C-alpha cells in the first residue's frame, strides 16, 4: 500500500489559509453590520486551547482509561476549562443575537468563524505532535 506523506510546509500553508478564513468570517461579521461585539468571540476561541496545552505538556506517555483508578485532576480541569471556553465562544454570539446587539447573519458568521479558528489551532497541534523516532521527510 502506498503511503501518502505531506511536507510540513504544505501543512503550515493549508492551516494558515484555514485560519485566515476563520478570521475573515469573524471580521466580516463585524464590519458588514457595523457592530464590533463579535470580536470578543475571537478572544475566547484563541484562549480555549491554552488550558489543555498547559496541563498536558508534561504527560506525553499518559494514557487515559476510564476504567483505571488513577486520576489526573490537572487534565480534568484543563478539559473542563477548554470545554467551558468553547461553549462560551459558541453561546456568546447567540446571547448577542438574543439581546438584539447583532443580526442573525452576523451570529452565524461569527460562530462558524470562531469554530474554524479553534479547530485550526487544534489541527495545528495535532499535525506537529510527532515522536522523536518518526521521520517526517519526503525524500528519506
Curated annotation (Swiss-Prot):
Its main location: membrane. The modification Phosphoserine is found at residue 137. It is a multi-pass membrane protein. Residues 33-37, 98-107 are lumenal. Keywords: Endosome, Membrane, Phosphoprotein, Protein transport, Transmembrane, Transmembrane helix, Transport. Disulfide bonds: none annotated. The keyword Flavoprotein does not apply. One of its GO terms (cellular component) is Vps55/Vps68 complex. Residues 1-11, 59-76, 129-140 are cytoplasmic. GO terms for biological process: late endosome to vacuole transport via multivesicular body sorting pathway; protein transport. It is found in: Endosome membrane. The chain crosses the membrane at residues 12-32, 38-58, 77-97, 108-128. Present with 2340 molecules/cell in log phase SD medium. Involved in protein transport from endosomes to the vacuole. Belongs to the OB-RGRP/VPS55 family. This is Vacuolar protein sorting-associated protein 55. It comes from Saccharomyces cerevisiae (strain ATCC 204508 / S288c). The lineage of its organism: Eukaryota, Fungi, Dikarya, Ascomycota, Saccharomycotina.
